[in-house]
From Swiss-Prot:
Motif segment (Gly-cisPro motif, important for rejection of L-amino acids): 137-138
Lineage: Bacteria, Pseudomonadati, Pseudomonadota, Gammaproteobacteria, Pseudomonadales
Highest taxon in the source lineage: Bacteria
Name of protein: D-aminoacyl-tRNA deacylase
GO cellular component term, pick one: cytoplasm
Locations listed in the record: Cytoplasm
Pfam families listed in its UniProt record: Tyr_Deacylase (PF02580)
Gene name of the encoded protein: dtd
Protein species of origin: Azotobacter vinelandii (strain DJ / ATCC BAA-1303)
Annotated GO MF terms: D-tyrosyl-tRNA(Tyr) deacylase activity; Gly-tRNA(Ala) deacylase activity; Ser(Gly)-tRNA(Ala) hydrolase activity; tRNA binding
Family as reported in the entry's similarity comment: Belongs to the DTD family.
Length: 145
């Protein structure tokens, strides 16, 4: 499982003109599910998302986590993160989880996040989404679990 996280001032996701998720200050996580991922992967990734220290403390150092700040978490499924781009000029998606597995695991990640964190929003799996964000930094990291 991969998550491309971006520290944001705000972010929202819309599907067919309808807002399906939005947050204020926090993290936007674009999540790619791979075939070997399972429920344990979800727990590990959520722990990292909530506890990765990417927010500034009083001295301006990246020393605080989303859990410590209580900011928003916007989870958006993005199977293209699992693409194999090592060769050629076109990505291969054979390294991404099949849609049924990806949807089940993404929805489980979203449900677990909502149990463990007060401000969680999500995109719609498999939909063509428009994601808007105001980057804070910019601060972007690729997490793997």
């Amino acid at each position: 499982m991969k998550a491309l996280i971006q520290r944001v001032a705000k972010a929202q996701v819309t599907v067919a003109g309808e807002e399906v998720g939005a947050i204020g200050p926090g993290l936007l996580a674009l999540v790619g599910i791979e075939p070997q991922d399972d429920r344990e992967s979800i727990g590990r990734m959520l722990h990292r998302l909530l506890n990765y220290r990417v927010f500034a403390d009083a001295e301006g150092r990246m020393n605080l986590s989303l859990a410590q700040l209580g900011g928003g978490l916007l989870l958006v499924s993005q199977f293209t993160l699992a693409a194999d781009t090592r060769s050629g000029l076109r990505p291969s998606f054979s390294s991404a989880a099949p849609p049924a597995q990806g949807q089940a695991l993404f929805e489980a990640l979203l449900a677990l996040a909502r149990e463990r964190h007060p401000q969680v929003a999500g995109g719609r799996f498999g939909a063509h989404m428009r994601v808007e964000l105001v980057n804070d930094g910019p601060v972007t990291f690729l997490l793997e679990a």
